[in-house]
């Protein structure tokens, strides 16, 4: 751990999101064994992912942002509120522009700018859209540690990366399985499934670098990442987690995911 502590925050963020990317790849790997996962299982897994993201948004991002804002010239609630709204608006803008397709939807229901891209490409872009704020959150968390603020700890940043990695497993499955079900080869389904997570290391570097270059934006950056993550949860994960019609599965999964992430953050952070 001491060797990891001595690395630059950008390298730490890269390693942290390298783990989360690896978990996306691991989640894509079941296509080598089965062609389909029961919808009920997917609903529970996606609910779990939603719970992890909600907990991470508060415990790892919003709470530190509020604490950092206390004692400043502005009201303590203002920087986190502004950053949170901007994060949601940013993701909403990308959602309107980037062509993508939600899981289980027909090609006619594709969102964003009109395109002739194949269904599989649109599915991959949808999950890639999920992963950007997750990578950004990890990068900002490691950047905050380098800023030497008491509310930001290396263990907390590691806990966030661990939680994001855990919830990336079902997201990898959610990309790879539909591709396999539509007739794509096992190898291609796996390849595109893991590829959806490649945006996380890129976003992490952006987040860590932004915080290092401008420390005063840290409360805004943390809450920005939280707003973007909550947008993804409400816009995509929760609806996708209820496709079987049994809302209890998604709800129980979300409760479990929230609890796991809360334990990780409190125990390690």
Features from the language model and the residues they span:
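Intrinsically disordered, metal-sensing/regulatory segments
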Residues: 1-269
């Amino acid at each position: 751990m001491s060797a990891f502590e001595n690395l630059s925050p950008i390298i730490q963020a890269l390693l942290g999101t390298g783990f989360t990317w690896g978990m996306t790849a691991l989640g894509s790997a079941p296509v080598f064994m089965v062609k389909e996962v029961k919808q009920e299982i997917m609903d529970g897994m996606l609910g779990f992912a939603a719970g992890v993201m909600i907990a991470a948004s508060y415990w790892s991002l919003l709470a530190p942002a509020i604490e950092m804002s206390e004692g400043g010239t502005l009201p303590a609630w203002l920087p986190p509120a502004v950053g949170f709204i901007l994060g949601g608006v940013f993701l909403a803008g990308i959602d309107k522009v980037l062509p993508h397709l939600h899981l289980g939807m027909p090609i006619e229901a594709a969102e964003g700018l009109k395109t002739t891209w194949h269904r599989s490409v649109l599915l991959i872009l949808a999950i890639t859209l999920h992963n950007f704020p997750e990578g950004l959150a990890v990068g900002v968390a490691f950047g905050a540690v380098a800023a030497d603020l008491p509310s930001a700890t290396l263990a907390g940043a590691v806990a966030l990366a661990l939680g994001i990695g855990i919830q990336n497993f079902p997201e990898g499955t959610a990309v790879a399985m539909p591709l396999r079900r539509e007739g794509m080869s096992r190898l291609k389904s796996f390849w595109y499934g893991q590829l959806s997570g490649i945006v996380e290391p890129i976003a992490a570097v952006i987040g860590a670098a932004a915080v290092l270059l401008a420390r005063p934006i840290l409360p805004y950056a943390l809450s920005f990442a939280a707003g973007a993550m909550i947008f993804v949860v409400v816009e995509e994960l929760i609806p996708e987690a209820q496709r079987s019609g049994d809302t209890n599965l998604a709800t129980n999964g979300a409760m479990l995911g929230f609890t796991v992430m809360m334990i990780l953050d409190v125990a390690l952070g």
